[in-house]
Amino acid sequence: MPSTPNFVRSNWSLVRTVGTTTSPFTGKTKTQEFDGVYWTAEVSLPPMRRSQAVEWQSFLLELNGTVNHFKFADPDALTNTGTYSTGHLTSELRTNSSSVTLSFSGSTITAGASTFGSAKVGDFIVVTGATNEDNNGTHKITTVTSATVVVTTSTFTTESNTASCKVRTNVKGATGLSLLASTNAASGTIKKGDYLQIQSAANTTGTPTQLVMVTEDATATADGAKDFYGVAIQPKLRSDLATGHYAVFTNPKGTFRLISNEVSWSADRISNYGISFSCIEVI
């Protein structure tokens, strides 16, 4: 995509697919969230002469309507506000148990095995298999009491000795990530409103699998050679983020395609061109 000129107007949206049913008798509403969550954008370029317009015309035409994809980002948030000092972080599965007995009380989770031995304060864990549905989902760790006990920001329904639960990190559906700084020297903040580019490999140049926004200032823990980061995100993680795969901090982008198969532009009497287009994140 051409780098200049920058857009003069942008409408940036997050679209969720949520089913809603309202009882005609009680008025109570039930909702169900589905996997279809994606960003959309409508953008307009400033008036430009033909020498610049042809770059954008060529780019848009080569997209072949909705067929081809391109990297794109929120035009008004191209640079993150956090001070994290290198280009990316890596995924680290500090908690990854596929079958463990769990008990829930207050804000505490107790495991029947050493599930939390590598967990850090600020990590986000995803629980599945609990009997009480409110106990499942993403939970943020505030205290690692021991290898079997953690305290979280959630309030649980009391439940004891439920077998075959899963406690994992960086899995599909997570609304928080457990990340590791890319080098011993990497440090700094990741701030609310920053974006991260989720990769399906250990590189920064491949096709992004998802673009997410940080929804609270990240928790950074210095413990050993590399800093650990717990990062709350929206939308939820679309697919598992494997160990070592990258979350790109510098110039993060998502993968987008045009919404329409039609490409058009306008020109005035002195040959100033006007170009606008709409795009949608690829799921």
List each model region and its residues.
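N-terminal ordered "arm"
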Residues: 1-48
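Oligomerization/assembly interface segments of phage tail-like spikes and tubes
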Residues: 30-51, 265-283
